[in-house]
Amino acid sequence: VSSTPLPASGRNMILTDRALKIKAEANNGERLKLHFDTGCSTAGLYYRYYEGHKSELDASGKREHITGGGFNIVVTKEILRLPSFRIKVGKVPVELKNLAVDTTNGDFQTSDDAGIIGMDMVNQFDCVTINLKEMFLKLE
């Protein structure tokens, strides 16, 4: 059995907190750790990221209320909606459109992740390799 070789950009996935994390880079070069969940249809940034980037996010986003949830929880909360948020994953540009940013503290976030990412990233590419042995995500 052959597997996809490790890309030149190296490993960009880690397993921590019993969950997969993607190492990404924001447009300003800042390193981000994002919870990677293929069961998640839309990406979002957590309050911790908002708190550290409040002025720039407030300037480019629009406030709105959303209702959503997950396993055994439904909430309505205020978010900031960004028209576009660009990152790089393994040196590959990714654009996340209509990104929700959590502006309220106190949710279930327990790690130091900047946010969550899932199928809205995966669906942008023709070929996505998730190699858990070598711990990398390759987007083509």
Residue ranges and their predicted role:
Residues 1-140:
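Pepsin/retropepsin-fold aspartyl endopeptidases
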